[in-house]
């Protein structure tokens, strides 16, 4: 049986750990509230941006915009969005494993598959298994639109230079505090809907200066918005996953403290009983 001193030391150690996990849970809860607000605000904007883009693309006549033009898809770029920090359960691991399955499925379809990671954990997981084309770290601690615009510009330039023919983004969509949805979203090429003659109310729009000019502005902006939304979704999911993981860790620590305390009390009782028996035996031997 372990000594009283070692058991007491373990109890103190677990209590200190529980203090840390409780603090991390509270911090994640506070950050989650802000992250949720950002996601709720970004979703309608991203959705409306997509609707406007589809309307414009559906009414485009003549030559397609380069970002709408379909070509033989031989080179794929997969953008994997994970967190920079750990201690959030299977948040990053599950996503990266889904990415690996996707890569395996697409190997027969594409001659070349490049990987771009956003977040340190995705890079660390994938670099030992695949060649990571580019890595963007420290963008998600405080996600901002400028960072998303920079990433979008990099992606668009590579696509126009035909470094890849298709771009897919993989990220965790925030659903609830305890769950996230692994999401694959095709960024490029953008597939327009069929030509739209009029909206639901029978109104036909006239675009000024022209559909082509508007698309030149809105297509890159849409890529920026979709990447920024994915970053916000990932951050909210990360804080939710970390809060859940730290809550579970705190509960496990409390259970362990209870078991160790019981073990400590039993060991202490056994030590006292042994000591009493020795005293009684000593007294009996003196009498004898």
From Swiss-Prot:
Its main location: membrane. GO terms for cellular component: plasma membrane; proton-transporting ATP synthase complex. GO terms for molecular function: ATP binding; proton-transporting ATP synthase activity, rotational mechanism. Signal peptide: none annotated. It comes from the Bacteria. It is found in: Cell inner membrane. InterPro entries: ATP_synth_F1_ATPase_gsu, ATP_synth_F1_gsu, ATP_synth_F1_gsu_CS. One of its GO terms (biological process) is proton motive force-driven plasma membrane ATP synthesis. Gene3D superfamilies: 3.40.1380.10, ATP synthase, gamma subunit, helix hairpin domain (1.10.287.80). It is a peripheral membrane protein. F-type ATPases have 2 components, CF(1) - the catalytic core - and CF(0) - the membrane proton channel. CF(1) has five subunits: alpha(3), beta(3), gamma(1), delta(1), epsilon(1). CF(0) has three main subunits: a, b and c. Produces ATP from ADP in the presence of a proton gradient across the membrane. The gamma chain is believed to be important in regulating ATPase activity and the flow of protons through the CF(0) complex. HAMAP family: ATP_synth_gamma_bact. This is ATP synthase gamma chain. The lineage of its organism: Bacteria, Pseudomonadati, Thermodesulfobacteriota, Desulfuromonadia, Geobacterales. The gene is atpG.
């Amino acid at each position: 049986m372990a000594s009283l001193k070692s058991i007491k030391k373990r109890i103190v150690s677990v209590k200190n750990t529980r203090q840390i996990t409780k603090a991390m849970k509270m911090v994640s809860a506070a950050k989650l509230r802000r992250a949720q607000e950002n996601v709720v605000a970004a979703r309608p904007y991203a959705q409306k941006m997509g609707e406007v883009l589809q309307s414009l693309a559906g009414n485009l006549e003549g030559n397609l915009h380069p970002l709408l033009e379909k070509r033989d898809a031989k080179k794929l770029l997969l953008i994997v969005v994970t967190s920079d920090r750990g201690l959030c359960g299977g948040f990053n691991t599950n996503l990266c494993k889904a990415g690996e399955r996707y890569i395996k499925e697409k190997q027969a379809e594409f001659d070349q598959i490049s990987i771009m990671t956003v977040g340190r954990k995705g890079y660390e997981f994938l670099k030992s298994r695949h060649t990571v084309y580019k890595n963007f770290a420290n963008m998600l601690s405080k996600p901002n639109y400028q960072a998303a615009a920079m990433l979008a510009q990099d992606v668009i330039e590579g696509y126009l230079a035909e470094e890849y023919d298709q771009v897919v983004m993989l990220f965790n969509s925030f659903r609830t505090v305890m769950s996230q949805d692994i999401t694959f979203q095709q960024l490029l090429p953008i597939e327009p809907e069929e030509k739209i003659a009029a909206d639901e109310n029978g109104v036909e729009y006239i675009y000024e200066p022209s559909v082509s000019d508007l698309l030149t502005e809105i297509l890159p902006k849409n890529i920026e918005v979709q990447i920024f939304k994915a970053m916000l979704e990932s951050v909210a999911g990360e804080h939710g996953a970390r809060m859940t993981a730290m809550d579970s860790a705190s509960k496990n620590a409390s259970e362990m403290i209870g078991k160790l305390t019981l073990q400590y009390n039993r060991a202490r009782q056994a030590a006292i009983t042994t000591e009493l028996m020795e005293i009684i035996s000593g007294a009996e031997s003196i009498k004898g």
